[in-house]
């Protein structure tokens, strides 16, 4: 069953899987104020919906997302202060969206069927997992326009090694799916007619795990990455103890010892 939300379409193709599909092909699925607002609203709602175990971000058309809408940015220059108040609002909103994806207790998968540039590439780098078509391409081309991709850089440098990130940022060149997988920007790529099924299969596999364990694990993953080695082990040791005291962990261990499938809480 589909729920039309203008430029964002949501459906539940498998149990526990919420798919959010950007459908503003005229703008190249740009991360406009409206698109980001709808994504933020949908992800916030999914975060507290127990029926949602995992989220897929996908798109219609040959462009996953072209980044911010440059026509809107140009028009904003006609406003007060050469558009500075609008620019601040736009990038604050984008930062909020990216942080929401990271802080969402549900894993978020990017399904990239085409081109992802600038903030669109940033969104790919921000997602927990990313799967692309073999024809997909990625770039942070702002430098070609005299506008360095500084905010996409935040996500990019957390997804790939510095030298690879700097090469993308300084040249603005496209990389293909083979290179994107090689540097760690995406997990894997498939032929376009296989992409949806492969992504859904992975999403379903994760959706069948303990929601509690997945949520705790995702939070711990990003939290410990900011710590030094000793702090990280101290923090994750406490998380392991807390996790062991949860009912799902008790059930999972018991099921393993009894050689049966665990019955986790829904």
Which residues make up each language-model segment?
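Hydrophobic alpha-helical membrane-association signature
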Residues: 35-39, 90-93, 195, 236
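Glycine- (often His-adjacent) and acidic-residue-rich active-site loop
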Residues: 44, 59-100, 228
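Crotonase-fold acyl-CoA enzyme core
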Residues: 99-212, 246, 251-254, 260
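C-terminal alpha-helix plus adjacent terminal tail
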Residues: 1-15, 172-178, 197, 201-266
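Conserved CoA-thioester-binding segment of acyl-CoA-metabolizing enzymes
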Residues: 1-60, 99
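Terminal peptide-recognition signature
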Residues: 20, 24, 39, 57, ...
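Hydrophobic alpha-helical segments typical of transmembrane helices
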Residues: 86, 93, 97, 152-155, ...
């Amino acid at each position: 069953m589909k729920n039309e939300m203008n430029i964002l379409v949501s459906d539940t193709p498998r149990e526990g899987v919420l798919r959010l599909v950007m459908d503003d092909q005229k703008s190249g699925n740009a991360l406009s104020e409206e698109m980001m607002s709808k994504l933020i609203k949908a992800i916030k709602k999914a975060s507290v919906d127990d029926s949602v175990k995992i989220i897929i971000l996908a798109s219609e058309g040959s462009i996953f997302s072209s980044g911010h809408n440059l026509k809107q940015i140009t028009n904003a220059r006609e406003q007060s202060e050469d558009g500075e108040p609008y620019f601040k609002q736009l990038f604050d909103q984008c930062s909020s969206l990216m942080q929401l994806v990271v802080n969402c207790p549900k894993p978020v998968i990017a399904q990239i069927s085409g081109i992802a540039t600038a903030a669109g590439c940033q969104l790919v780098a921000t997602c927990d997992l990313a799967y692309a078509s073999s024809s997909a391409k990625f770039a942070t081309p702002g430098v070609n326009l005299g506008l360095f991709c500084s905010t996409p850089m935040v996500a990019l440098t957390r997804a790939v090694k510095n030298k690879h990130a700097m090469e993308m940022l300084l040249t603005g060149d496209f990389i293909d799916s083979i290179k994107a997988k090689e540097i760690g920007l995406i997990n894997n790529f498939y032929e376009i007619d296989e992409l949806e099924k492969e992504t859904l299969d992975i999403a379903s596999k994760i959706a069948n795990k303990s929601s509690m364990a997945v949520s705790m694990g995702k939070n711990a993953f990003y939290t410990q990455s900011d710590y030094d080695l000793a702090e990280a082990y101290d923090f994750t040791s406490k998380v392991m103890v807390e996790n062991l005291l949860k009912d799902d962990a008790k059930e999972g261990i018991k099921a393993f010892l009894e050689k049966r499938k665990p019955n986790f809480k829904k």
